[in-house]
């Protein structure tokens, strides 16, 4: 990090599991890594919408260590090189995550303004967002801790609320940006005067928990409340100062966590023991509700946190009957519904306000007004140790992917795809043998002390306990069918001896 105190450093929080968007979102393939609203994933959209912000530095990403290769690949596909990718061994909410990001950002004497962004939000009006960020940077430079409050358009029970306090004067030197509107609006985030606009900001009076519907209606009707977006802006040192004041135990744990961090390829792996001992808390509870320097900038930019299937339905394009559909879908007498077909035809008749989500291994059917309860299904699946809560049939790996086609107690059939030039780890299994049949491309196979090459329609056998490795030496993807047989077929029956992706040792 350069010693440029004027730089804005985006801190992208990509550690969530997105349980309310099951079955499309899974613990090992969460919603921020999915293309939910267009061809880009939520993470990619979060990063690319920052283009055009002045004094912007390369983003710092915080993610679960299980997602690291998918995060790196998605950033590579949009030609973004992050300043760092910090790997959380466990989730500890936003206050510790941002503390570690701030400590990392200040290495070498820098003290940037942090722009803290969840990786799974939708923002449609980039110009309005950039204008709010510009004003946030100026206020952050004056010592304020900024949160962005979304101007509400309906009573909402799924968000927390922020009560606006006294309006603060614009920071000297604030820019006026050109807009097409000439009307004057006072209640929202922007004052339109002629063809010039200026963001306004308020002291934070207080934060409100997620209300019930009756209270939400009262909050909205008062005109004094905004939705809590979970986006923040402050100088790194100011956040750490306030954290030291209000949650010194969190700051101490985070210092130990970063001190014990190790470099792992292009990632920074945080000290798991130190981080596990850190108290879990949000920025709101740990700092923003206690500091006297909290400022809220109202935001009208087409924001949505995509916190449920009904929220996603709201932002998607709909037909004349109010239906949002994706995939091979046929409807008759269906209205105000969201239907997603991931792997086969889905037909629906006589439905109103429903959600149907079809994937290769699970189907969700729910009333749209019950969308928040999907997380209860995921909790039940986890309690039953069902794999559908964790991953899809198709699982991405740094070398390619595999898809489970069929399985029983003592056998499993997988379709494996290995990218050109990629290879799996040198490994062995203690409880299963494997048959490999190549259906496309060329495979170089290490089997004990033997190295062989096989091509389409050829096969080989890997006995139980045999050291082996699979490589793709060709220029096209390698596809093969793997038939596993044995007493135990779990993915944790892999003992690795050499791995180019840093996954040495037993895979647990």
List where the protein language model places each region:
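Short, basic, low-complexity termini and linkers enriched in Ser/Thr/Gly/Pro
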Residues: 1-3, 170-200, 506-508
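Conserved N-terminal catalytic core of the sugar/cofactor nucleotidyltransferase
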Residues: 1-12, 20-30, 35-118, 122-128, ...
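Left-handed beta-helix
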Residues: 2-7, 237-437, 442-461, 468, ...
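Short coil/turn connectors at secondary-structure junctions
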Residues: 6-8, 56-57, 80-82, 109-112, ...
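Residue-level signal for inorganic ion chemistry
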Residues: 43, 101, 120, 162, ...
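A residue-level structural signature of the nucleotidyltransferase/glycosyltransferase Rossmann-like core
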Residues: 114, 205, 231-232, 304, ...
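Conserved core of the sugar-phosphate nucleotidyltransferase
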Residues: 125-171, 198-265, 269-275, 295
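Noncatalytic nucleic-acid binding interfaces
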Residues: 480
């Amino acid at each position: 990090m350069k010693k440029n105190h004027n730089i804005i450093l985006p801190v992208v929080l990509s550690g969530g599991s997105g349980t309310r968007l099951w079955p499309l979102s899974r613990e090992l393939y969460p919603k921020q890594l999915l293309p939910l609203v267009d061809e880009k994933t939520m993470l990619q959209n979060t990063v690319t919408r920052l283009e055009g912000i002045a004094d912007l530095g390369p983003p710092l990403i915080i993610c679960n260590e299980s997602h690291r290769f998918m995060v790196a690949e998605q950033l590579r596909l949009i030609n973004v090189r992050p300043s760092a990718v910090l790997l959380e061994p466990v989730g500890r909410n936003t206050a510790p995550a941002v503390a570690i990001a701030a400590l990392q950002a200040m290495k070498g004497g820098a003290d940037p303004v942090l722009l803290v962004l969840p990786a799974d939000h939708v923002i449609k009006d980039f110009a309005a967002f950039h204008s709010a960020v510009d004003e946030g940077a100026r206020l952050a430079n004056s010592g304020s801790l900024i949160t962005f409050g979304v101007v509400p358009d309906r009573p909402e029970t799924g968000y927390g609320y922020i009560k606006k306090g006294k309006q603060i004067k614009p920071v000297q030197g604030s820019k006026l940006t050109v807009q097409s509107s000439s009307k004057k609006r006072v209640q929202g985030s922007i004052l339109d005067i002629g063809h010039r606009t200026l963001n306004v900001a308020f002291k934070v009076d207080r934060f409100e928990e997620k209300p019930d519907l009756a209270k939400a209606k009262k909050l909205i009707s008062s005109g004094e409340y905004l939705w809590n977006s979970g986006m923040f802006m402050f100088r790194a040192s100011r956040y750490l100062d306030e954290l030291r004041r209000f949650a010194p135990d969190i700051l101490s744990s985070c210092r130990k966590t970063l001190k014990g961090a190790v470099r792992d390829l292009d990632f920074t792996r945080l000290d798991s023991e130190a981080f596990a001992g850190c108290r879990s808390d949000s920025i709101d509870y740990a700092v923003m509700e206690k500091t006297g320097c909290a400022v809220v900038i109202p935001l009208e930019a087409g924001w949505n946190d995509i916190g449920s299937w009904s929220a996603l339905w709201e932002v998607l394009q709909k037909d004349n009957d109010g239906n949002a559909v994706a995939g091979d879908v046929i409807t008759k007498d269906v209205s105000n519904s969201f239907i997603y077909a991931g792997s086969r035809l889905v037909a629906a008749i006589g439905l109103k306000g429903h959600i149907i989500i079809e994937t290769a291994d699970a189907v969700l059917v729910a009333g749209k007004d019950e969308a928040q309860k999907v997380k209860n299904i995921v909790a039940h699946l986890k309690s039953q140790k069902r794999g559908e809560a964790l991953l899809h049939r198709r699982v991405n790996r740094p070398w390619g992917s595999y898809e489970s086609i069929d399985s029983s107690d003592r056998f499993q059939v997988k379709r494996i795809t290995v990218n050109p030039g990629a290879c799996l780890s040198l490994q062995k299994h203690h409880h299963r043998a494997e048959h490999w049949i190549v259906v496309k491309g060329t495979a170089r196979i290490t089997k004990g002390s033997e190295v062989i090459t096989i091509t389409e329609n050829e096969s080989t056998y890997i006995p139980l306990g045999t050291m082996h490795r699979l490589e793709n030496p060709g220029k096209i993807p390698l596809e093969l069918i793997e038939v596993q047989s044995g007493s135990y077929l779990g993915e944790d029956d892999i003992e690795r001896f050499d791995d180019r992706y840093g996954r040495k040792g037993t895979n647990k």
